[in-house]
Amino acid sequence: MTTNYIFVTGGVVSSLGKGIAAASLAAILEARGLNVTIMKLDPYINVDPGTMSPIQHGEVFVTEDGAETDLDLGHYERFIRTRMTRRNNFTTGRIYSEVLRKERRGDYLGATVQVIPHITNAIKERILAGGEGHDVVLVEIGGTVGDIESLPFLEAIRQMAVEVGREHTMFMHLTLVPYMAAAGEVKTKPTQHSVKELLSIGIQPDVLICRSDRAVPANERAKIALFCNVPEKAVISLKDVDSIYKIPGLLKSQGLDDYICKRFSLNCPEANLSEWEQVIYEEANPVGEVTIGMVGKYIELPDAYKSVIEALKHGGLKNRVTVNIKLIDSQDVETRGEELLKGLDAILIPGGFGYRGVEGKIATARYARENNIPYLGICLGMQVAMIEYARNVAGMENANSTEFVPDCKYPVVALITEWRDENGNVETRSEKSDLGGTMRLGAQQCQLSDDSLVRKLYGEPVITERHRHRYEVNNMLLKPIEAAGLRVAGRSGDDQLVEIIEVPNHPWFVACQFHPEFTSTPRDGHPLFAGFVKAASEYQKRQAK
């Protein structure tokens, strides 16, 4: 089987939506019966985004095999059925570290190690490895054409087009076509200059995706085709839409998938986008709406919680309701109190690190518990729920986590020093371990209690969910907390770690150590988020009586 490669680049400005465009195209090709995957190549020097600030980079998306990756991989998994792995994302930092390790080992036999050929060869090797077994691989190059950081990646894909063959490679370039209100027309010159920059590197784009706030007129697309040396049918208008799930249909309506299949000589049936049409219908025709408060510490950049926000929307789709998300800074809860939490139909506390804002999250968990408001805690959201219950119900005054107060009297949450990874191997950590790549990461099995709410929601006794944490419930202090009424609803596969807790005498209070948002998709949803949004709707109805 021959693998075909589509290299996706961006020009003029950043944040054009290369990831969404690539994922949408992949969704159409998958709907034609092709085996598709997507890769993201990031030009920064960090080995991975694991230690980067969420406010700078956005969320860290965790794959099944425990890789900490770019948030675009979350988009990929929400659009196609293929699960991402550590092969689907790598950075300049990882490439350089591998090449330097080989140099120290003597693998280059005394050669002068250079960007070309050693770095570019390493990039090509990773792309080829990630594409094995697939009909089509979309490779998104992070950054903007013209950035110095992206040059090794662009040179590598230029070489791949020669080595793999132009009949099995395509270059798709996203560019901005701005509308100038004063002139009353869109302007194509930025696109022309962006393509000129790409040509200077030796890359002739085969497809141009023209991003604009409106449809690009046919005469302007013809102009772009003429000056950029691209067939007119390969100049695609991609206007702003109110739902990203409309983009596959928008690309298909302009024949992009037909053009690609013809170019690669792929004989496959027409794309069936009925599942996406159903998603769009459910999104556009809700029968109600709920307001869910999300209390976190990175709310100035919603992308820090991208998968959680999308998962809540998916939960809304499964219940035919619109989910309005109110982002609340946990530090504001500390200073202003409960007034910020009034009027909510449900409360969610997502993951996070560090002491800042933690007391506000603990106060939020208490407010939800005492006022019978549906509550979903994720990762740190479970830990603060445990701390709150220990303090205010189990009588453990000033209970805390050793992450925040290392010498607290009741460390109900503590560092995990030993656990098994996704392959069953024993992992060990200490307070002196590096921060990067040292957490409990990836898919882990969880056993659900027969009498629990989550057992009913999932409908099966054993589930698999993805983790990203280094602190856990301290089993040494668990018995008195359980005696005070808290239910452990899920444990790790080896029965050693607490994975899910519930408050039994509460309408809906669930907190989990894992990250269910990473496996939620618009077509399938997720049991926890569907149940959470349903509970919010029921709470709203009770309040209205």
Swiss-Prot record:
Example of a GO cellular component annotation carried by this entry: cytosol
EC number: 6.3.4.2
Pathway: Pyrimidine metabolism; CTP biosynthesis via de novo pathway; CTP from UDP: step 2/2
One GO term (biological process): 'de novo' CTP biosynthetic process
Region of interest (Amidoligase domain), ranges: 1-266
Residue ranges constituting the Glutamine amidotransferase type-1 domain according to the UniProt record: 291-542
Binding annotation for L-glutamine: G352, L380, G381, M382, Q383, E403, R470
Additional free-text comment from the UniProt record: CTPSs have evolved a hybrid strategy for distinguishing between UTP and CTP. The overlapping regions of the product feedback inhibitory and substrate sites recognize a common feature in both compounds, the triphosphate moiety. To differentiate isosteric substrate and product pyrimidine rings, an additional pocket far from the expected kinase/ligase catalytic site, specifically recognizes the cytosine and ribose portions of the product inhibitor.
Role summary: Catalyzes the ATP-dependent amination of UTP to CTP with either L-glutamine or ammonia as the source of nitrogen. Regulates intracellular CTP levels through interactions with the four ribonucleotide triphosphates.
Name of the protein in question: CTP synthase
Record lineage: Bacteria, Pseudomonadati, Pseudomonadota, Gammaproteobacteria, Enterobacterales
